[in-house]
Amino acid sequence: MFESLSGQLGTALSSLSGRGRISEANIRDAMREVRDALLEADVHEGVVSDFCDQVVADAIGRKVTTSLKPGEEIIGVVHDRLVELMGPVDSHVMLVDPGPTILMLCGLQGSGKTTTCGKLAAYLKGRGKSVMVAAADLQRPAAVEQLGIVTRQVEQEGRGQAAVHFYAEPDKCAEYGKATGIAVGVCRRALKEAKKTGVDVLILDTAGRLHIDDPLMKELESINRAVNPHQIYLVVDAMVGQDAVNSARSFHERLAVDGVILSKFDSDSRGGAALSVKRVTGAPIKFVGTGERFEDLEEFHPERMAGRILGMGDVVSLVEKAQQEVSEQEAEQLAEKMATGRLT
């Protein structure tokens, strides 16, 4: 992901990197290319406009450090704004004591939610936390069976010694759709079993749909009220792009999602969802799925992602070092003024 966007941004910013002096016109010309690159990457249009306006304003008003070329300063501005766009993020799963900590996963059908449940269980198991995974997606009996297979594989093959349990009521699949509250009842009983077993974390795999509809949202809202999860995570397919952001916004409006997990992040998708979802929904990206193995779930770090997008980690480090040196120099000058009584 981001290979195409990284190349286009590199081309746009390279027009500035060799210049000894940069005018406002130079900056605006470069940002037009940046804007085109972001739109082509399927970043939300409103996000792109705000981002480019902020970079231009920052770049024009920024004091250039003596040890940097102006073009390097602009790269630093773009990097900082990318970090702000995707962050701040705290990827740690905040556990409650006494447990269990309840994590509710939701998402559209095909988003990779069931696999992500397994990856999240493996992530927690590897950190010494016992987990129970509960199957509350009852509209498809195969979904319950698949989650059971995934959970047992994590229990047998996952790193760490902590236990991973599976809770399911497969007979309830036949009742699902004929009466309301079936999935809610399963979640309540799963929580009761999790408390009885003494696990640290309960993960609820809820029902998905091919598209967002009111019955789905009402069911999720009912589960939310019934078990009061500590965190609600929305699983979003990174390959879907702009549609993923729109669905994330719809989920967040009804459920107040605490974080987003981007699945299929290792795909050749254009990356627009990663750059848009935080600004559009207010919910930060917590994790990204980077492969098919259970351990392929990574904490999301905006700083690292911004450096990866720009493909200019050395330049960004140079900017940060130069800014630190300027801050130290200013501090020394201030101390000198205070010592000589010249502070005004």
Labelled PLM ranges:
Residues 1, 26, 66, 70, ...:
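Catalytic cores of large soluble enzymes that bind and process phosphate-bearing ligands
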Residues 1-2, 341:
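Compositionally biased, charge-rich terminal segments
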Residues 3-179, 186-200, 204-206:
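Primarily NTPase-proximal linker/entry elements flanking Walker-type ATP/GTP-binding cores
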Residues 155, 171, 187-190, 195, ...:
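Conserved phosphate-handling catalytic cores of large alpha/beta enzymes
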